[in-house]
């Protein structure tokens, strides 16, 4: 039997990390929240906070070695992954593994693994290390194409390119938003897909893999805007997605929840990307499931049982975005947003705002998907993100 409390360190303290911290504390864990800026959302509910550049390998190793947590849970992509590998060799448990974190931080590594080594169905793709090479490799894929940095997060630096003349601009956008030291992009054929889904995949230490009902979602500028559960797909498509998700997560190893993304194109299921942690589209599970994706992640990480997973007939989420730069923030409209039954609003507690920054999410549940999607949209539309300095 494992004794509690356990010490959990979060590398990344945004809105997803905040929910992981809350789930961990409900299980009696001590939480250390780390990020590059002070007062990040998870720090507001953690026992201890550490502020440092997590791309700095020396700083990262010093903080982890000083606290010696039972588990280290990466929550963002911008990390010194080489330091995680060294820490793992020194006996620190990295979730799910240091290798999984490194692979999924780099689009080229996870794509080469999925398409090359594991034979999963992906969009056609190529890599380029400069603008001239990008023009050469993009043309055979047909137009339009999608250009992304191999290292970035939340869709940053992603462009849909309609003509060859737009490739220089796409290259500049990718380089301006790339994470780390990479100067490479991945260019993909543009898929005319019917639906994007996330399959939350829970890999347990007992070897059993569980799946949440699929989550449909829509993106703008590479960022999630809304999600709903369950996504409508055939049994055959779901079986294909589960088989691919199990294949890739088994290869990456470790324990925890993975967000595995797919495109549905007709009867085809095409692997897109993977996050070795709770997924932003999975925020809907806070209202849709008896155990949210954050609780499921912690149970798998801490080797706790998951005896039953139940889901509402229909649930949906809609993000709440800022529309301008704000040094401090305040909110209006919460009373109106919560008037409908089966509705919740989460405001993440981010200390400042910028255009299109995700500041919160509206959640709704009910019996009908179209009904709950509209209800979440109405609730989100009620919330205004305002200048906090004028309201003190």
From Swiss-Prot:
Reactions it catalyzes: N(1)-(5-phospho-beta-D-ribosyl)glycinamide + formate + ATP = N(2)-formyl-N(1)-(5-phospho-beta-D-ribosyl)glycinamide + ADP + phosphate + H(+)
Taxonomic lineage of the native organism:
Bacteria, Bacillati, Cyanobacteriota, Cyanophyceae, Synechococcales
What family does this belong to? Belongs to the PurK/PurT family.
Which sites bind Mg(2+)?
Answer: 261, 273
Q: What InterPro entries does the annotation carry?
A: ATP-grasp (IPR011761), ATP-grasp_carboxylate-amine (IPR003135), ATP_grasp_subdomain_1 (IPR013815), PreATP-grasp_dom_sf (IPR016185), PurT (IPR005862), PurT/PurK_preATP-grasp (IPR054350), PurT_C (IPR048740), Rudment_hybrid_motif (IPR011054)
* Protein name as catalogued: Formate-dependent phosphoribosylglycinamide formyltransferase
Keyword annotations of the record: ATP-binding, Ligase, Magnesium, Metal-binding, Nucleotide-binding, Purine biosynthesis
One matching Pfam family: PurT_C
Say if the entry is tagged with keyword Transmembrane helix. no
């Amino acid at each position: 039997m494992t004794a509690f409390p356990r010490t959990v360190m979060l590398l990344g303290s945004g809105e997803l990390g905040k929910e992981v911290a809350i789930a961990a504390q409900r299980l009696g864990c001590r939480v250390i929240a780390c990020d590059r800026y002070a007062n990040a959302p998870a720090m507001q509910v953690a026992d201890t906070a550490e502020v440092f550049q997590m791309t700095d390998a020396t700083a990262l190793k010093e903080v982890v070695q000083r606290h010696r947590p039972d588990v280290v849970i990466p929550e963002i992509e911008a990390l010194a992954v080489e330091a995680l590998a060294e820490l793992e060799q020194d006996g620190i448990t990295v979730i799910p593994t240091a290798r999984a974190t490194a692979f999924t931080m780099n689009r080229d590594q996870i794509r080469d693994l999925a398409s090359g080594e594991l034979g999963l169905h992906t969009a056609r793709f190529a890599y380029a290390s400069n603008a001239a090479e990008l023009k050469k490799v993009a043309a055979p894929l047909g137009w339009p194409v999608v250009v992304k940095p191999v290292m970035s997060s939340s869709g940053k630096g992603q462009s849909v390119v309609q003509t060859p003349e737009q490739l220089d601009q796409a290259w500049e956008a990718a380089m301006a938003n790339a994470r780390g030291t990479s100067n490479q992009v991945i260019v993909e054929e543009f898929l005319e897909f019917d639906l994007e889904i996330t399959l939350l995949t829970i890999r347990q230490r007992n070897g059993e893999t569980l799946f949440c009902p699929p989550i449909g979602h829509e993106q703008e500028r590479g960022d999630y805007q809304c999600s709903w559960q369950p996504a409508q797909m055939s049994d055959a498509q779901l079986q294909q997605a589960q088989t691919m998700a199990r294949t890739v997560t088994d290869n990456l190893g470790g324990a925890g929840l993975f967000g595995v993304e797919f495109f549905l194109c007709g009867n085809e299921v095409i692997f897109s990307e993977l996050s070795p942690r709770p997924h932003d589209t999975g925020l809907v599970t806070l209202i849709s499931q008896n155990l949210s994706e954050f609780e499921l992640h912690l149970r798998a990480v801490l080797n706790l049982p998951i005896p039953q997973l139940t889901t509402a007939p229909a649930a949906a989420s809609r993000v709440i975005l800022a529309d301008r730069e704000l040094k401090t923030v305040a909110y209006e409209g919460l009373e109106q947003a919560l008037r409908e039954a089966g509705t919740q609003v989460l405001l993440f507690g981010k200390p400042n705002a910028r255009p299109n920054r995700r500041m919160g999410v509206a959640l709704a549940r009910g019996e009908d998907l179209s009904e709950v999607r509209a209800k979440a949209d109405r609730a989100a539309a009620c919330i205004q993100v305002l200048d906090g300095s004028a309201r003190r």
